[in-house]
């Protein structure tokens, strides 16, 4: 009988072994084979006093020695367990494959703090001894032990997932009566059914295990179907921390600007939960199908007495990571716009589609994403300059055809003012001839430079300012069908001229968003809203 959880230990973390009344020799203690291959490294196993006896000679010999230790997770013990009473053992007395571990002697842990699933229902007397150990990252067991574990098979213990079970109803007070939700007309009890997900292609990189935490619990229920015998206005369902894990993006959506539809919970059924135990309403896109609003109670927020009174014998079991606390609960309001549909038929269709996709894709070793055959645009703008050396940030170019091949779509030329001399109309012809000669000479002295898409816009704008009057036009309008060239050039000109103002507006929008996020975070955590006395903003670097 054991439970496992994730954990680690800092190198060199030791503690002095003091005089103790219980120090067994556990080198021959063997765990299930799946534990040695699991990403969870901490195990809590029950010991038996008649089998794992106290080694008095070893306790006297190792008294005062430095023994490896680690932080024992409090989430594996219900209530307030005296974790400081653990006795960490020397490495030679630990089971094979463990780098640190300790024991709680018989009667050290109160019965209310002893793991629920590790004691028999009819156990009497003092609490049995308990072993808490941290496995090494890589364990190589002897071949004899591996063959023994293969013959024994997997232990029918709670390995990675546990099924939360209610205690017997005789623990209720005699004057209290169970008010099960199945007997009410305004609420219904549902069972959360997770649609089968399509198989994911194997990845060469191992996935990092995310530790289970219950400070906040916001699952994504968009792929969950609620199966209910009767359709009522509100429905209640027990969720699974294994099948419906916490999703950080959903938590950010609830604390951001996204709308979370709310409704009033029946006060005669649900207690008033405040602070971290309050129900969290989810955005509409993360709700199950057919629901217009819904909220989630995180694990441990509702008492076990409430589950026994209102869920009773009708509560469907769901796998949980930790059975020491009550499971999460979903309360949803059914949408009146969506018509009732056959859930079983929908489940069969989804399951059939998942099976067909699994048969077609499950045998593939790896799925490489298709690369679209889209040419990468490198160039952006071609500019005529009077100097052979290209401007800062630009590159030399031979012709407009070469610029078009690089992806350039805009060309910039130096504008020339046309001065009309009305006082000397007889000299128009000679003046036009002189201008033609100057223009031809200037054309011979002009050079082409091009800028990339990711070039510095300030350098491009400064070069255009040095040109004086600059005129922008499209290199080839026929290559851009359906594009309003005049509108594009107008917007580009505004970007060049008002770029500083645009940056200031974007910076202000970012600061406003940060202010709203900090304010909503403080409201969610019930913290007083304080502004910085220097900059007038919410928590900043001056705090």
Swiss-Prot record:
Keywords: Repeat. InterPro entries: DM7. Residues 415-443 are annotated as: Disordered. Residues 415-430 have a biased composition (Basic and acidic residues). It comes from the Eukaryota. Belongs to the DM7 family. This is DM7 family protein GG19680. It comes from Drosophila erecta (Fruit fly).
């Amino acid at each position: 009988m054991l439970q496992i959880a994730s954990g680690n230990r800092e190198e060199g973390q030791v503690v002095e072994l003091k005089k103790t009344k219980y120090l067994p020799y556990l080198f021959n203690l063997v765990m299930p084979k799946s534990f040695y291959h699991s990403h969870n490294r901490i195990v809590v196993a029950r010991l038996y006093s008649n089998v794992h006896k106290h080694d008095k000679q070893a306790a006297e010999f190792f008294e005062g020695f430095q023994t490896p230790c680690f932080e024992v997770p409090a989430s594996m013990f219900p209530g307030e367990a005296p974790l400081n009473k653990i006795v960490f053992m020397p490495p030679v007395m630990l089971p094979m494959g463990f780098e640190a571990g300790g024991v709680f002697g018989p009667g050290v842990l109160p019965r209310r703090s002893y793991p629920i699933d590790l004691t028999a229902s009819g156990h009497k007397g003092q609490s049995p001894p308990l072993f808490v150990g941290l496995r090494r990252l890589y364990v190589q067991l002897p071949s004899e032990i591996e063959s023994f574990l293969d013959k024994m098979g997997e232990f029918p213990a709670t390995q990675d997932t546990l099924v939360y079970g209610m205690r017997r109803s005789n623990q209720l007070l005699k004057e209290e009566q169970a008010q099960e939700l199945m007997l009410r007309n305004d609420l219904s009890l549902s069972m959360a059914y997770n649609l089968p997900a399509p198989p994911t292609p194997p990845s060469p990189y191992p996935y990092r295990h995310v530790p289970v935490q219950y400070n906040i619990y916001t699952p994504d229920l968009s792929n969950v179907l609620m199966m209910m015998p009767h359709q009522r206005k509100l429905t209640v369902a027990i969720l699974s921390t294994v099948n419906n894990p916490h999703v950080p993006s959903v938590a950010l959506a609830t604390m951001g600007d996204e709308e979370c539809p709310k409704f009033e919970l029946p006060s005669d059924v649900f207690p008033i939960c405040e602070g971290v135990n309050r129900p969290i309403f989810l955005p509409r896109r993360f709700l199950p199908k057919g629901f217009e609003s819904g909220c989630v109670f995180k694990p441990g927020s509702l008492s076990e007495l409430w589950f026994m009174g209102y869920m009773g014998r009708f509560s469907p079991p769901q796998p949980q990571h930790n059975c020491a606390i009550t499971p999460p609960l979903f309360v949803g309001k059914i949408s009146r716009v969506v018509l009732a549909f056959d859930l079983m038929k929908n489940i069969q269709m989804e399951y059939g589609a998942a099976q067909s996709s699994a048969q077609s894709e499950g045998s593939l070793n790896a799925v490489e994403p298709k690369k679209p055959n889209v040419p990468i645009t490198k160039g952006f703008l071609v500019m005529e300059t009077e100097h052979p050396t290209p401007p800062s940030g630009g590159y030399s170019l031979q012709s407009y055809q070469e610029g078009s091949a690089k992806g350039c779509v805009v060309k910039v030329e130096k504008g020339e003012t046309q001065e009309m001399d009305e006082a000397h109309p007889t000299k128009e012809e000679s003046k036009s001839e002189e201008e033609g000669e100057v223009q031809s000479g200037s054309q011979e002295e002009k050079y082409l430079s091009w800028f990339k898409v990711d070039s510095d816009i300030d350098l491009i704008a400064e070069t255009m300012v040095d040109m004086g009057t600059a005129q922008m036009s499209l290199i080839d309008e026929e290559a851009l069908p359906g594009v309003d060239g005049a509108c594009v050039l107008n917007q580009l000109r505004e970007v060049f001229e008002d770029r500083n103002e645009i940056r200031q507006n974007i910076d202000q929008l970012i600061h406003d968003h940060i202010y709203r996020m900090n304010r909503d975070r403080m409201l969610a955590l019930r913290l007083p809203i304080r502004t910085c006395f220097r900059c007038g903003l919410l928590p900043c670097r001056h705090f």
